[in-house]
Amino acid sequence: MSLEVNWEQIASSEAIREQLVDWLNDQLKAVEVPKYLADIHVTSLSLGSKAPEITIRDIGKPFDDFYDIEEERAGTGEGDEDDGRVAPTSTPMKHQTSGSSDQTDASNPISPSTSHDHENDMQFVTEIKYDSDICVEVAAQLLMNYPAEKFISLPVRLKLSDLLIHTLAVVAYVNHRVFISLLCDISENEDTDNTESHSGNLRALSSKTASRIDVVKRLKVESELGSYEPDNGSILRSVGKIETFLVDTIRNLLVQEVGWPNWIEFQGV
């Protein structure tokens, strides 16, 4: 079953763009950057006009992990007294790591919930193919640390575009919260109609996720240096290193922050 996405409404939302930029910058602040790089941050983001292709492979009850975090919040007084009912345009995006792995059957780390569920709770396992025209602009300072530290500082502007993602993901709705997590990547010659999730056998799938999450199939990076001498090869080599660093960082962020058993969360939906 395929889903039609009102991508124009999502892509034109300033609130969503701001949340994504803030989230990316928060992640970049936590990344250990090379000594030749400083002040790296996202300056703008456009989601483009191409909507992702979404196909539902399984519908069922949300994983217990999503309820466990809800119970933890209730125990610490973090729950929303009004059930988080706020305007969708102001829904905060959070990152969460599953904290229930020691309470779950090791042979079935992602099992559907058998309790706690609210009346409208549900979960979709979806195939997402996103051949995008997204554009992310990043600014940074390129440092030349010879003959002294920060001897020269040059502004660098980078544009990330042509992102291609093909993945199996879980989207769960639990008590006015939406959880999104990537389960595994999908190769272009893989028969997703016969995937484990389509038959509901998520136990077999869960054992593969750690080694299979590499959802970025393509990412183009273009760079522009503020000023440099044409014959200064060391600077040009450093720019190439920045491009490689950014691509690796994006790949790692998706795996570490959104790959199961981690997820991002939208509240007040």
Curated annotation (Swiss-Prot):
One GO term (biological process): mitochondrion-endoplasmic reticulum membrane tethering
Gene: MDM12
GO cellular component: endoplasmic reticulum membrane; ERMES complex
Oligomeric form and interacting partners: Component of the ER-mitochondria encounter structure (ERMES) or MDM complex, composed of MMM1, MDM10, MDM12 and MDM34. A MMM1 homodimer associates with one molecule of MDM12 on each side in a pairwise head-to-tail manner, and the SMP-LTD domains of MMM1 and MDM12 generate a continuous hydrophobic tunnel for phospholipid trafficking.
GO molecular function, one term: lipid binding
Compositionally biased tracts (Polar residues): 88-114
Cited PROSITE patterns: SMP
Protein name according to UniProt: Mitochondrial distribution and morphology protein 12
Domain SMP-LTD: 1-269
Known role: Component of the ERMES/MDM complex, which serves as a molecular tether to connect the endoplasmic reticulum (ER) and mitochondria. Components of this complex are involved in the control of mitochondrial shape and protein biogenesis, and function in nonvesicular lipid trafficking between the ER and mitochondria. MDM12 is required for the interaction of the ER-resident membrane protein MMM1 and the outer mitochondrial membrane-resident beta-barrel protein MDM10.
Family that this chain belongs to: Belongs to the MDM12 family.
Xref: CDD domains: SMP_Mdm12 (cd21672)
Keywords in alphabetical order: Endoplasmic reticulum, Lipid transport, Lipid-binding, Membrane, Mitochondrion, Mitochondrion outer membrane, Transport
Organism domain of life: Eukaryota
Record text about domains: The SMP-LTD domain is a barrel-like domain that can bind various types of glycerophospholipids in its interior and mediate their transfer between two adjacent bilayers.
InterPro entries: Mdm12, SMP_LBD
Source organism of the structure: Komagataella phaffii (strain GS115 / ATCC 20864) (Yeast)
Subcellular location(s) per record: Mitochondrion outer membrane; Endoplasmic reticulum membrane
PANTHER family the record matches: MITOCHONDRIAL DISTRIBUTION AND MORPHOLOGY PROTEIN 12
Major subcellular location class: mitochondrion
